[in-house]
Amino acid sequence: QASTDYDDEDESTVPEAR
């Protein structure tokens, strides 16, 4: 899972393309 690129339910990380 690419949590660093896309956050599933965790808004702690900022995704590049949302």
UniProtKB/Swiss-Prot annotation:
Conversion of fibrinogen to fibrin is triggered by thrombin, which cleaves fibrinopeptides A and B from alpha and beta chains, and thus exposes the N-terminal polymerization sites responsible for the formation of the soft clot. Its main location: secreted. Disulfide bonds: none annotated. GO terms for biological process: blood coagulation. The modification Pyrrolidone carboxylic acid is found at Q1. It is found in: Secreted. The keyword Ligase does not apply. One of its GO terms (cellular component) is extracellular region. The modification Sulfotyrosine is found at Y6. Keywords: Blood coagulation, Coiled coil, Disulfide bond, Hemostasis, Pyrrolidone carboxylic acid, Secreted, Sulfation. Heterohexamer; disulfide linked. Contains 2 sets of 3 non-identical chains (alpha, beta and gamma). The 2 heterotrimers are in head to head conformation with the N-termini in a small central domain. Cleaved by the protease thrombin to yield monomers which, together with fibrinogen alpha (FGA) and fibrinogen gamma (FGG), polymerize to form an insoluble fibrin matrix. Fibrin has a major function in hemostasis as one of the primary components of blood clots. A long coiled coil structure formed by 3 polypeptide chains connects the central nodule to the C-terminal domains (distal nodules). The long C-terminal ends of the alpha chains fold back, contributing a fourth strand to the coiled coil structure. This is Fibrinogen beta chain.
